[in-house]
Curated annotation (Swiss-Prot):
Pfam family, one: S4
Region annotated Disordered, chain positions: 31-51
Keyword Cytoplasm among UniProt keywords: no
GO cellular component, one term: small ribosomal subunit
HAMAP family: Ribosomal_uS4_B
Name recorded for this polypeptide: Small ribosomal subunit protein uS4
Gene transcribed to yield this protein: rpsD
Biological-process GO terms, alphabetical: ribosomal small subunit biogenesis; translation
Organism: Bordetella avium (strain 197N)
Similarity annotation: Belongs to the universal ribosomal protein uS4 family.
Function: One of the primary rRNA binding proteins, it binds directly to 16S rRNA where it nucleates assembly of the body of the 30S subunit.
Gene3D superfamilies: Ribosomal Protein S4 Delta 41, Chain A, domain 1, RNA-binding S4 domain
InterPro entries listed in its UniProt record: Ribosomal_uS4, Ribosomal_uS4_bac-type, Ribosomal_uS4_CS, Ribosomal_uS4_N, S4_RNA-bd, S4_RNA-bd_sf
Lineage, opening ranks: Bacteria, Pseudomonadati, Pseudomonadota, Betaproteobacteria, Burkholderiales
Entry GO MF terms: rRNA binding; structural constituent of ribosome
Sequence ranges assigned to domain S4 RNA-binding in this UniProt record: 97-160
């Protein structure tokens, strides 16, 4: 299955919540009508959604939020099941540990898609070595740096300025002048993906 390249607002409207697919430079309310489903008139059916349908929606939220396709998502779930602890929380921590997501959290990209592009264009170093695989998992203590040749890109500076105005997450440490950051640890569950019920995702894959 190919990666979705259509309108980003459409995905957020479908899930009824902000999936953080658009830059925060403008309020999402000015771009997307989250209370209206995609389509000419939206979906007005009052039919109750089945448990399976609700579980599927929660999975779709996570996949779309982090830009992950089904095959890769299943791998993350299998790894989360293999590890000790709460499977749903571990799944989200794995998604948060993806290189493209950490680049986004550090403010080098204004969206995960933009951060993924920086990685694929070899603009990012991980522990002093060029890293071009967006799905790489970052570990606590790993250092991420914008490569010298990419530091002149205006979009990176703009993204850093935007991140500084919004607030850098506490689980990463960033030196915006040097365009480098350290991944301190995976975030606490309460700090991320607050509109997602990951227990439903676990139930879906346990069917």
């Amino acid at each position: 299955m190919a990666r979705y390249t259509g309108p980003k607002c459409k995905l957020s409207r479908r899930e009824g919540t902000d999936l953080f697919l658009k830059s925060a430079r403008r309020s999402l309310d000015s771009k997307c009508k989250l209370d209206s489903k995609p389509g000419q008139h939206g979906r007005t059916s009052g039919a109750r959604t089945s448990d399976y349908g609700l579980q599927l929606r929660e999975k779709q939220k996570l996949k779309r939020m982090y830009g992950v396709l089904e095959k890769q998502f299943r791998k993350y779930f299998a790894e989360a099941e293999r590890r000790r602890g709460n499977t749903g929380e571990t799944l989200i921590q794995l998604l948060e540990s993806r290189l493209d997501n950490v680049v986004y959290r550090m403010g080098f990209g204004s969206t995960r898609a933009e951060a993924r592009q920086l990685v694929s264009h070899r603009a990012i170093e991980l522990n002093g070595h060029t890293a071009d695989i967006a799905s790489m998992l970052v570990k606590a203590g790993d250092v991420i740096t914008v490569r010298e040749g990419a530091k002149k890109q205006a979009r990176i500076r703009e993204s850093l300025d935007l991140a500084a105005s919004i607030g850098i997450p506490q689980w990463v440490e960033v030196d915006s002048n040097k365009m480098t950051g350290t991944f301190k640890s995976p975030p606490d569950r309460a700090d991320v993906a607050r509109d997602v019920n990951e227990s439903m995702v676990v139930e879906l894959y346990s069917r």
